[in-house]
Regions:
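Short strand-connecting beta-turns/loops that link adjacent beta-strands
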Residues: 7-9, 18-19, 65-66
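A short beta-turn/loop motif at secondary-structure boundaries
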Residues: 17, 61-65, 88-89
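Nudix hydrolase/Nudix homology domain
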Residues: 20-23, 88-125
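Conserved N-terminal beta-strand and adjoining loop/helix that marks the start
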Residues: 1-11
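The catalytic Nudix box helix
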Residues: 25-57
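Conserved positions in beta-strands of structured domains
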Residues: 5, 58-59
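Active-site-adjacent beta-strand/loop module that shapes the phosphate/pyrophosphate-binding cleft
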Residues: 61-83, 95-99, 109-116
Length: 125
């Protein structure tokens, strides 16, 4: 998963078209014989149209009950992230958030709390 901030420090989240349509950090599955960083770059390009400039490991979220490990990378992109976006087959919407929406994935909640312990977890009321 990618932690991408804009100039204001807001974090990029995507809302998927399939499943429960929850907000999450950009990212996806690693293909056979693909490195973690290559998979991350491919997924970010596919989901957001942004091109990755640099990737730095941040932390890991182990989910043994699901048999999954999710890895978080801090990502900088080749151009400043903007709010201009066109939906894709996988992604219904995206946006930069200063608060984590209540309808977010467990992994997004885990990483948000770890990366932004002082930031709000819910939209303003």
């Amino acid at each position: 998963m990618a932690w991408i901030e804009n100039d204001e420090g807001d974090v990029l989240l995507v809302r998927q078209t399939a499943g429960r349509k929850l907000w999450t950090l950009p990212g996806g599955k690693v293909k056979r014989s693909e490195s973690l960083q290559r998979a991350l770059k491919r997924e970010i390009q596919e989901e957001t149209g942004l091109r990755v400039a640099a990737v730095r490991y941040r932390q890991m979220y182990d989910r043994p009950k699901r048999g999954a490990i999710t890895v978080l990378f801090a990502v900088s992109v080749k151009r400043n992230p903007t709010r201009t976006y066109f939906p894709t087959q996988e992604i219904a919407d995206l946006g930069f958030f200063d608060r984590l929406p209540t309808n977010a994935t467990p992994s997004a909640k885990f990483f948000w709390k770890a990366e932004y312990p002082g930031k709000h977890l819910n939209p303003p009321g």
